[in-house]
Amino acid sequence: PSVSFQLPVIDFSDQNLKPGSSKWDEVTADVLKALEDYGCFEASFDKLSVELNRSVFEAMEDLFELPIPTKQRNVSSKLFHGYLCHNLYESLGINDANVLEKVNDFTQQLWPDHGNKSISETIHLFSEQLVELDLMVRRMIMESFGIEKYIDEHLNSTYYLTRLMKYTSPPDDDDDEETKLGLRSHTDKNIITILHQYQVDGLEVKTKDDKWIKVKPSQDSVLVMVGDSLCALLNGRLHSPYHRVIMTGKKTRYSTGLFSIPKTGVIIDSPEELVDKEHPRIFKPFEYTDFLHFFQTEAGR
């Protein structure tokens, strides 16, 4: 069973939120505490206006209404990056959606004749705003652990995947708990994930003491979550929380995710500043694609 619970809410809307300011230090302390306690927090961020959220929601409705063969043209050479469909879950993926040209490539896959200018612009603007939040959070985390000298190198070592997700409600006559699982319990493998859900709740996060909590962010806020690669980079100083999606009721659930992901060839290794007698090295250095492939094998499950 899960319980409703309010995760820490941290406001990133202040105009004075610049590195080095007292406001920055205050928010950084809140971010660190929330991530140490839960591995995630709710961020309120006024750049996600009501209009922008509505445009993204409408874009998702239009995209998912396309025929399956059309959606299957959303392909990528990267593992798990294109169109995915499993039970109640369906998803489209756009690499580097903070670059307008890349979003145009995505809409061109689905509408080869003319793309879709308004959907491209909406997804690009939305991704751009979330990237800004991702960069702030990662800078704060690195400052908190005294490894700010690696900030630029770290921020340049990643790229972004924007994922649009649709969860269909389970059939009426189905009481099987398993089928209500929109997405099974998992940790994210990347650096940071920023999730936004539209109108229908369903996301649950596991706490350190193994309790499932229902996460109900307000419409103008997002959930910021630590991924396994960040946990490894920080030598286990933060943890990546298990989370899942439970579908109850009759409404279709839409959500978006922005994932910061290590670029191909980047080796994830804890800086020596985070390794000492009390904190011996926990993870062998690894390359992200190898890590993903490992989780695809029996040993990794």
Curated annotation (Swiss-Prot):
Known cofactor(s): Fe(2+)
Keywords: Dioxygenase, Iron, Metal-binding, Oxidoreductase
Protein residues bound to 2-oxoglutarate: 253
Keyword Oxidoreductase: yes
EC number from the UniProt entry: 1.14.11.-
PROSITE patterns: FE2OG_OXY (PS51471)
Domain Fe2OG dioxygenase: 158-262
Binding site residues for Fe cation: 186, 188, 243
Record keyword Secreted present: no
Cofactor annotation comment: Binds 1 Fe(2+) ion per subunit.
Single GO term (MF): metal ion binding
Gene3D superfamilies referenced in this protein's UniProt entry, alphabetically: B-lactam Antibiotic, Isopenicillin N Synthase, Chain
Origin: domain of life: Eukaryota
Protein purpose: Probable 2-oxoglutarate-dependent dioxygenase that may be involved in glucosinolates biosynthesis. May play a role in the production of aliphatic glucosinolates.
Assigned protein family: Belongs to the iron/ascorbate-dependent oxidoreductase family.
Name assigned to this protein: Probable 2-oxoglutarate-dependent dioxygenase AOP1
Lineage: Eukaryota, Viridiplantae, Streptophyta, Embryophyta, Tracheophyta
Gene: AOP1
